[in-house]
């Protein structure tokens, strides 16, 4: 199996970026919802938030297989792709699976 380390590293950096901007994003959301400020100011703050933090959103993060780096057919319970989980289940290496039975 080929491990896609560069893609895994990119996903790790995206998660770190999200964690860094999470506090700023929450502060801006609170400022936008604050009814004491003028509506124009709230909208301006919201536009700043949207324009600067596009790359750090939670939806930009993709779950990847920890062995192969594959994104498609990802099984969340095992953190593996379908192919890797199938091989490990056949060998009996997965928890709570005696044999490949699915």
From Swiss-Prot:
Pfam families: Ribosomal_S14. Belongs to the universal ribosomal protein uS14 family. It comes from Paramecium tetraurelia. GO terms for biological process: translation. It is found in: Mitochondrion. It comes from the Eukaryota. One of its GO terms (molecular function) is structural constituent of ribosome. This is Small ribosomal subunit protein uS14m. InterPro entries: Ribosomal_uS14, Ribosomal_uS14_CS. The keyword Chaperone does not apply. Keywords: Mitochondrion, Ribonucleoprotein, Ribosomal protein. The keyword Transferase does not apply. Signal peptide: none annotated. One of its GO terms (cellular component) is ribonucleoprotein complex.
């Amino acid at each position: 199996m080929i491990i896609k380390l560069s893609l895994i590293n990119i996903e790790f950096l995206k998660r770190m970026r999200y964690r860094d901007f999470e506090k700023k994003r929450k502060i801006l959301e609170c400022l936008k919802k604050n009814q004491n400020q003028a509506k124009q100011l709230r909208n301006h703050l919201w536009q700043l938030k949207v324009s600067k933090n596009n790359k750090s959103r939670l939806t930009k993060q993709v779950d990847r297989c920890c062995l192969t780096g594959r994104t498609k057919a990802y099984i969340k319970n095992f953190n593996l792709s379908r192919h890797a989980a199938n091989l490990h289940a056949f060998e009996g290496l997965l928890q709570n699976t005696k044999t490949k039975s699915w």
